[in-house]
From Swiss-Prot:
Any one Pfam family match given in the protein's UniProt record, by short name: Asparaginase_2
Organism placement in taxonomy: Eukaryota, Amoebozoa, Evosea, Eumycetozoa, Dictyostelia
InterPro entries for this protein: Ntn_hydrolases_N (IPR029055), Peptidase_T2 (IPR000246)
Subunit structure: Heterodimer of an alpha and beta chain produced by autocleavage.
Catalytic residue positions: T207 (nucleophile)
Molecular-function GO terms, alphabetical: asparaginase activity; beta-aspartyl-peptidase activity
Domain of life: Eukaryota
Role description: Has both L-asparaginase and beta-aspartyl peptidase activity. Does not have aspartylglucosaminidase activity and is inactive toward GlcNAc-L-Asn. Likewise, has no activity toward glutamine.
Positions marked as site (Cleavage): G206, T207
Organism annotation: Dictyostelium discoideum
Record-listed substrate binding positions: R235, V236, G237, D238, T257, G258, T259, G260
Name of the protein described by the UniProt record: Putative isoaspartyl peptidase/L-asparaginase
Catalytic activity: Cleavage of a beta-linked Asp residue from the N-terminus of a polypeptide; L-asparagine + H2O = L-aspartate + NH4(+)
Entry PTM: Cleaved into an alpha and beta chain by autocatalysis; this activates the enzyme. The N-terminal residue of the beta subunit is responsible for the nucleophile hydrolase activity.
Amino acid sequence: MNKKSVLVIHGGAGVISKSTISKEREEIFLNSLKNILLAGKIILKQGGTSLDVVQEAVRLLEEDPIYNAGKGSVFTELGTNEMDAAIMDGTNLKAGAVGGVSIIRNPIIAARAVMEHTNHCLLVGKGAEEFAKSKNLEIVEPSFFFTQNRYDQLLRAKDEKKLILDHDGENLLEKEKEKEKNNETSTTTTTISVGVDPIDPKYKMGTVGAVCLDSFGNLAAATSTGGMTNKMHGRVGDTPIIGAGVYANKNVAVSSTGTGEAFMRTVAAFDIAAMMEYGSLSLKDASNKVVMEKLITVGDGGVICVDKYGNVEMPFNTEGMYRGYVIIDNNCENDQNDIINVSIYK
């Protein structure tokens, strides 16, 4: 048995600071993260595998509408929800992903089904949805994913002919509404112009993810997202791209959040693993080099990582990232040596 088991989760990165998020909303996120970590801890304590744990952690994140994934997914320019998800097993490099799905309740479950029941890594759109139906996964009406807050973001983006990238748009919009309530004039920019390059590095991100080391020493990673508010119909980001939004092997597991196109261009998740394997860098050095030196030149965001020794790194180059981890001492029968931590800001 491995000396320790570890679960790390994130709920997205972006313009998340104490000046853009209310204390009440801060507590909602922290409690949600903690509860999901506790649920994952139970599975690990019962001898669950890393693959089962990351799937369940991400499924729970998808079920909570405060995150931009599953139930809380943002809307496209057409007023629809198009979700992406991916999962990877570090023990054998098997992976599965879905992209642009609109009626699958939990895209992460569909991603695992792709991994386990097809010879492919990625299915998209209607094909992915038909496959999910064939595997008796839960299918819902598109209206299931409607949330007023996300729809308000879309209306605002359309009204200003802009693109809002969660969590920035959500938190800054919340702050602006608060100012309007107090009859103040807000000068905070909540959106970015759609132009040749709509991915402004100052504004990002909405994704959820999990990485895990189980008691058997196995690693796994999973990521899920609704994308960005007012995105083009058919746009797919880094989340379902193996090596960009998610990666796991026998040394490390990584889940990304941030400027999707930047993570694809830098193959960020795989780059961390490659630096560790071929450059003999530590998890800390590799993850920080990618996020703080390489990624930042083309976009913003962060990653959560755990290596085969149970070391945890969660670097991000934005103002904040919803994140947390639980570390379980497998040599101790009770919980006295277990560690759980949740945080938002730097």
